[in-house]
Amino acid sequence: LSRLNKKLLRDLATHWAQVGAIVAVVALGIIMFTGPLLATRDLKDSVNDIYKRTHYEDFSASMDQAPATAAGRLASLPNVTTAEGRIIREAQARVLGHRLTVRVITVPDKGRPAVNGLIIEKGSYLPPGAGGFTMVEHHLSSEFNLKPGLPLTVVGDSGEMTFSISGSVVSPEYLRLVRSRAEYVTDPAQFGVI
């Protein structure tokens, strides 16, 4: 060994604690960088998978009123593969003695949504042709431990209506429950989606 290498080995042996601390700090830095990076990549893959499975919207537009034929006319435009209309309203609800605001989102009378499809978590999809049933989004279901068959009462413009819960669903629009762009986090005990 050359004199310089011998001196290096002597210095490493003398300052072993400092060398160990430097190695530990570098290793922790690498772990702290790669851990979140890998978690973000996995989360992005999961979200993209759900978006693909549910045919998540590329674009949406809100309006107060539109003719029933509007979605069909939009679907006939070039480069538009699917367009679907639905009604979205907010109302007050009671579930297991708790009052909260719910966002009521309609689904097609026949079949399942072609855009923003739903993944059944518990229970089943709405029974065809049967009224009086609703599905609840999984944040609401988890918050109140809702199971199929339990009642949910909605108070709207036309009065009070009680529905039987048919199932709990995951919606691509509400992977993270947010009521509006002004809120960063929404309390599922105060707001839900049905």
Segments from the language model and where they lie:
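Hydrophobic, regular-secondary-structure patches
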Residues: 18-103, 124, 128, 139-150
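Residue-level signal for secondary-structure boundary sites
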Residues: 69, 112, 173-174
